[in-house]
Design a protein with these regions (language model features):
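Conserved kinase catalytic-core helix
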Residues: 135-161, 187-217, 221-222, 260
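Haloarchaeal acidic low-complexity proteome signature biased toward cell-envelope/secretome components but also
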Residues: 1-64, 267-286
Length: 286
């Protein structure tokens, strides 16, 4: 990452308050579509599962997931599907074509393969999910809704994150961060010639998240990407509210990861100083 790119400072915006809307995880329209299996859905299902880029990913696309993708197409959020951008144990991310020929990212969570016990640990204590049951499907659907809500809240707080577009069951559609050729590189994948500036931006993003009542929970050089002169924070699915019983431990871990990375880049920083900066005189407190 060369100096010619520069790093833009985040635009100051009014941070959201401490209100948290309850998130519904009841059956979706996709569940109904999967149950009824009409002819149009069956045709869509056959086309998608026969596509070359999806033939090796059959475990991801059960009927309910295909119904969710079908509903997203019907609603105009997705017009065509491309190949995978990344694959993981719990979710795959695919490039897709959205309205007006814009590229979007489609994140598909595997309900059967997801570590729902770990997911539940992040959901418990979140006021948006009070009374959430123990069903695996409900946990994963809540996680998808949570990721979209976290992205939306972070954007309102002035943090550069992918814009959430739509959710349907275990699928999240969001802004694609990258070029026609490839996804944006992670901070840990590039040479940073201006690490002090990058550190200041990341520190400010962490502060804005905290002031908005959120803690990333897994922040490191691998959950920050560089795109068009900006640092973009990604993977907010596990982000918790400051009211979460483990919020302090998650915040301390984020501070340790960020300080360790920038310390290796020659920046004079330490996790205690970063933690103090984030929490002292904040508009919220853990």
């Amino acid at each position: 990452m060369g100096k010619e790119y520069g790093l833009v400072d985040p635009d100051p915006v009014e941070t959201p308050g401490d209100e948290w809307d309850e998130i519904d995880v009841s059956d979706t329209e996709a569940d109904r579509i999967a149950r009824e299996r009409d002819r149009e859905f069956d045709q869509f299902r056959e086309r998608l599962t026969d596509a070359d880029q999806f033939k090796v990913e059959q475990s991801v696309f059960d009927d309910a997931t295909l119904a969710a993708l079908y509903k997203l197409v019907q609603d105009g959020h997705v017009e065509a599907f491309g190949g995978p951008l990344s694959t993981g144990k719990e979710a795959n991310v695919y490039l897709a074509l959205g309205p007006d020929e814009t590229s979007v990212a489609v994140k598909v969570y595997r309900i059967n393969a997801s570590n729902f016990r770990q997911m539940r640990e992040y959901l418990e204590g979140d006021p948006r999910f009070e009374g959430l049951g123990g069903k695996k499907k409900d946990i994963v659907l809540a996680w998808v809704k949570k990721e979209a809500a976290n992205l939306d809240r972070a954007r309102k707080a002035g943090v550069r994150v992918p814009r959430p577009i739509a959710t349907e069951r275990n699928v999240l559609v969001m802004e694609y961060i990258g070029t026609d050729e490839k996804r944006a590189p992670r901070l840990g994948e590039v040479h940073v010639e201006n690490p002090e500036t990058a550190h200041e931006v990341v520190r400010e993003y962490m502060r804005r998240l905290y002031d908005a009542g959120l803690i990333h929970g897994d922040l490191s050089e691998y959950n920050i990407v560089f795109h068009e002169g900006q640092l973009v924070v990604i993977d907010l699915g596990q982000a918790v509210t400051v009211h979460h019983p483990n919020s302090r431990a998650f915040l301390e871990r984020d501070c340790a990861n960020v300080s360790r990375y920038f310390g290796r880049q020659g920046v004079d920083t330490d996790e205690d100083a970063l933690l103090k900066y984030l929490t002292e005189d904040s508009t919220d407190s853990a």
